[in-house]
Amino acid sequence: MSTNFIYPPPKDGKPFRLSLGLRELDPANWIEAGSDLVEQLKQRKELLETKRTVVFQEIVGYEEAALTYARALKDNLSKFHSDYVVAGDQITHKPTGITVNLLEDHPFVQLAQVIAEDLCLLSYENSTWNLVAGVVIFPSRWQLLEKIGKNIDAIHGPVPGYQGALQPLMVDTFNKISPERPVWRRNWSLHETEELHEPTYTPHQVEISDYWWRTERQTLTKSKSNQFLLFTIRNRSEPFKWIKEDQQATSEFVKTLESLDPQMLEYKRLAQASRGLIEFLKN
């Protein structure tokens, strides 16, 4: 596989299927930096200032849990990331000079200005997990305002096949995550532009060769009380054409694309482009 992709397209040629695919997370990798971080931080600050209600929502009453997680992330930055200086509740990202204090606004809003990860707080209530706070600056065609306060089944309702493949497993799987063993997974999509802030889908007329490979690296960390989960999302957008630097990866990903059923193609906004993408990979 080309070394360009941070998280490359699947190379196993297996048919696409919905799965959680959880893996144990090394605490040293809870937060990811990367060459795109500085540019992302500029976008994040601007969007927090101009579209706050779009990118931040909360249910009142969960501030303490959010602050506890924010402080844990702050300590993690201090321990594992030399580009940060931490003093009390203040965090400075040295390359940009951005400084925030977790107590001067909602802690997720503050933290989101110095890391690339979006942050969602889930609370276990009424035998399910509910989204009670979130900073989602780079949504992939979904709107935080529509999801806040809902449980995980309602949040994932639009995903084709979710009810049969994942709904029976989600709550139990989340319940089994232990505070001592956080987990991570990844997700992918193909987009017509490199824009990461895409709360709604807007069609663009682009050449197939100009599509973008979008990945989400997601983590789940349970609180010591077992009542809360912090869900983080690290978004990246990279030129899809990089895949052609690896002949095996190209041919195997064709099989994955060909396995997508009409409902999933429509959900991923690839119904019109799938044939062109496959031909692009084959030629």
Give the ranges of each region predicted by the language model:
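Extended, well-ordered protein cores
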Residues: 1-283
